[in-house]
Amino acid sequence: MPVPGTLSVEIPPRYCPLPTARHPDETVLARRTADWIDGFDLELTPQQRARMRGNDCPGFYGRIMPHSPTDRLQLAVDWCTVMFHFDDVHCDEGPATGRAARFADLATRIVRVLEAPDARLEGPGDTMLAPVRDLALRARRWATPAQMRRCAEAHRAWFLAVAWELGHRAARSTPALNDYAHMRQHTAAGAATLAWAEIVDGAEIPDRELSSPEVRALTELAFTTAAFDDDLFSYGKELWVARAEGTAPSGLGLVEILRRENRCGRPEALRAAVCLCNRLTHRFIALRERVLPDASAPLRAYLDHLCHLLPGNLEWGLTADRYRNPDGRTPGAVTTTASRDTDPPADTSPPAIPSIAWWWDPLGGRP
């Protein structure tokens, strides 16, 4: 397959006035996670090891939880490292034929190991279960039973969404924007990512707060906005891979979905995607101001992580090799540039997407 050369994408200005921060021990976290991975027989190729490093999980979680104790944050960084590998190998890449069955088989066993790490499970992909079992056992040193339940359920939601995505890949179909908008938070493992953050924090968020409509709306807003931003970062990768394979870009990304649904060109679709992200960010900030005054200390910590997730993910995504090295063998093949804007968007109304419209009225008209 010929290498298609380099490709550049310029993203229109993203509204995000939230400040960024970095964890001071990201280098330490990176060294420890590399040593941890070496302790398992994952049969990694040199290329896969390079991709693990290039994904920069210390930089990802270090931007979400910049003030967390290093030893505890290591748990989340280790999870991120092995799950990005899982995502690359079993979710995103390679022919779709037969992938769904292999993915489902391994995914169900991963969830079971999180629920019951001492359970004996055998089958294809067993090498992936050893690091997951180690994570589950380490997490139990700090986590409450409710936190471990939330963690397992978050992974189940993630894997269900990936199965939905794999169905579209196998059928070479493009989901409707209305469906994609509410599913994207799950295909991006949003809840799983923050479930580990709660375990790292230690304090359990009261369910009456975490399950309240306004906090649920805030959570979905943050996860979806970050995932849509991932679609912006990965758009160059999608175009590069399509050019290399001589095919049309995948229809499983926000920009392509908007392009096909609105029947417009790629520049117009890219602008529409950024406008949508800007409106979601504005709504998140406005709703956060309503929720924050009455939040408990554990919920405040959770909301702080969400506030760091949005700008941190923007910053991380522009530099992570995950998007710059599209096939794992061509470093720097894709360059994505973007700028941040602190001026609120002109349009802050709910978008015409019924599945997410409730974020603008989480109490259903009640005061």
Curated annotation (Swiss-Prot):
Provide the effect of W158A.
Decreases levels of cattleyene with simultaneous production of several new compounds
Cofactor(s) listed: Mg(2+)
**Which class of enzymes does this protein belong to?**
lyase
Supply one GO molecular-function term: terpene synthase activity
Q: Where is this region: Disordered?
A: 325-354
What changing W79A does, per the record, is: Produces only minor amounts of cattleyene
Quick one: which residues bind geranylgeranyl diphosphate?
R184, K237, R322, Y323
Its name, as the record gives it, is Cattleyene synthase
Species, as recorded: Streptantibioticus cattleyicolor (strain ATCC 35852 / DSM 46488 / JCM 4925 / NBRC 14057 / NRRL 8057)
Q: Which lineage is the organism of this entry classified under, starting from the top rank? A: Bacteria, Bacillati, Actinomycetota, Actinomycetes, Kitasatosporales
